[in-house]
């Protein structure tokens, strides 16, 4: 079974490894090397590193639409499947028609919900209790193709986007292998997505990370979980940015102004919200490492009755 794999970040690495272990990977397409770090040295994508370790040919077009020579290379490979996992480019129709069987995409949501760039983050921000991976046939739209297989993951009240990312990342490779085998044996009937049930998971940005304490404690807690590890929800204390990595909700109410620090202890910082109370457990100030509140207050103070903004 000849596979061409297209992917870029760490999330795609277990899927590539699963392809290498189970099929014949004839080529890997990934994004061009990018400047990274203070020295701005060119760095390979995680997918490229794994491809080179396995002596697989690597192709790095800036744009498949504008570099037809890469499409010709794809045609020459004559793949049975093109497998796409967080590649970072929308494939032209000409590419979608190349493989013998299909172009299959692994998407980190239970489609049709959360099409788009940041599905697992928005699932947590919106307080979903389940997420998962979906394999789908690719078409010219954005995550709109027919669904093939899904796998579900429960989201508990403390799970962060980073933790959900790692679970889906590891499980995705197995789902892809299963999908390919069942497509070849004719065991899968593609299912059209119900567009009336879709919602779009837009890219994250730092502007959305500023906490609005007039919202409910549950909403703020979900924002904190959904933006961990990036861009990380934040507020201001004593005119300094205070990032918040972990929290939990108290089923109590306060008549204090939203954002008011009610109490500080080893268990965390109790903060009044528009509805309910949030207990902040892990924080970070500029130039410092993230610390549990218990560690932070050993040498620093957070004033009770101060207002976070």
From Swiss-Prot:
The keyword Nucleotidyltransferase does not apply. It comes from the Bacteria. It is an enzyme of class 2 (transferase). GO terms for cellular component: cytosol. Keywords: Protein biosynthesis, Transferase. CDD domains: FMT_core_Met-tRNA-FMT_N (cd08646), Met_tRNA_FMT_C (cd08704). GO terms for molecular function: methionyl-tRNA formyltransferase activity. Disulfide bonds: none annotated. (6S)-5,6,7,8-tetrahydrofolate binds at residues 109-112. PROSITE patterns: GART. NCBIfam families: fmt. Attaches a formyl group to the free amino group of methionyl-tRNA(fMet). The formyl group appears to play a dual role in the initiator identity of N-formylmethionyl-tRNA by promoting its recognition by IF2 and preventing the misappropriation of this tRNA by the elongation apparatus. Belongs to the Fmt family. This is Methionyl-tRNA formyltransferase. It comes from Clostridium novyi (strain NT). The lineage of its organism: Bacteria, Bacillati, Bacillota, Clostridia, Eubacteriales.
